[in-house]
Design a protein with these regions (language model features):
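Hydrophobic/aromatic residues in alpha-helical transmembrane segments
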Residues: 33, 70, 113-114, 151, ...
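Membrane-helix interface/capping residues of multi-pass secondary transporters
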Residues: 34, 43-46, 114, 161, ...
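Transmembrane helix-bundle signature of multi-pass secondary active exporters and lipid flippases
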Residues: 19-72, 138-145, 236-246
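Small-residue-rich hydrophobic transmembrane alpha-helices
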Residues: 46-108, 145-164
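Alpha-helical transmembrane segments of multi-pass membrane transporters/permeases
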Residues: 99, 154-180, 191-198
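Short alpha-helical transmembrane segments in multi-pass integral membrane proteins
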Residues: 1-19, 74-143, 185-246
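Hydrophobic transmembrane alpha-helices of multi-pass small-molecule transporters
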Residues: 58-61, 175-179, 205-209
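Helix-loop interface residues and adjacent transmembrane-helix termini in multi-pass membrane transporters
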Residues: 28-31, 40-43, 77, 157-158, ...
Length: 246
């Protein structure tokens, strides 16, 4: 798929369907999470998930900050013919390094300050117990939620929008059926919903990683140069954070 010479209409609808599909399945499994927990735990269960919602906003926003910001500049450099000097790979590398740093900080922050954060987001003693139980499996794979956002953005700009959608779709489908299986047949309640979410994110991550074994892959990690200057990728990504948060 050639972004420079391909048919504009075909390219537009290919990328539109991929982006729409990803957003749709993300919305669906968020609703299913709420429905399953609500049926099992009652109103307190859905309220506990609402308390956790800001945590998702933060980690998704950080992933978009690196992914959207980095992938836009990556494509710009490649489209301008600068891919030969490896400048586009520099921005992919910078985005990966930035993602690792932000994921580590968010992970540590969540582990150390989980209780005060959830209380700040509105949990009382009853909701706090449920929210913390939901977060037990989620905390294990918490960085993957950031990496998935970053990888999906780069895959779409590396000519693999279908794989990015497949990654989100496969994780979402696993989450939907995992919610039912872990919550009801396994009688895990809100913990089961968290487990399904954690495993679904892992499935998405593994599916998107297959891109790096593909012949179509042009994403390369290189030795970073003038890394501080590459931080301008955050200027391209912060607008997306505003959309997600507000």
């Amino acid at each position: 798929m050639n972004l420079l010479c391909g048919n504009i209409k075909t390219l537009y609808f290919k990328y539109l369907s991929a982006a729409f599909g990803s957003a749709l399945i993300s919305s669906i499994y968020g609703i299913v999470d709420m429905a399953m927990v609500g049926q099992y735990q009652g109103p307190d269960g859905t309220a506990a998930l609402a308390v956790v919602a800001p945590v998702w906003n933060v980690i998704y926003s950080l992933g978009l900050l690196m992914g959207i910001g980095g992938s836009v500049i990556f494509s710009t450099k490649r489209g301008s013919g600068m891919s030969g000097d490896g400048e586009n790979d520099q921005y992919f590398t910078a985005a990966v390094i930035g993602s690792v740093i932000l994921a580590a900080l968010a992970w540590i922050g969540l582990i150390l300050f989980e209780r005060p954060l959830l209380m700040f987001f509105g949990a009382d003693e009853t909701l706090l117990a449920l929210a913390q139980r939901y977060m037990i499996p989620v905390k294990v794979v918490f960085p993957l939620f950031l990496f998935n956002q970053m990888l999906a953005a780069f895959l779409r700009n590396d000519g693999a929008p279908a794989l990015a959608t497949l990654g989100v779709l496969s994780g979402g489908i696993f989450n939907v059926f995992g919610d039912w299986f872990f919550v009801f047949p396994c009688d895990m309640g809100v913990y089961g919903a968290g487990l399904a979410t954690a495993l679904g994110s892992t499935v998405s991550f593994l599916v998107m990683l297959t891109h790096f074994a593909s012949r179509k892959n042009t994403l390369r990690l290189v030795k970073p140069k003038r890394l501080a200057r590459k931080s301008r990728l955050t200027k391209r990504g912060y607008r997306r954070i505003i959309v997600v948060e507000f």
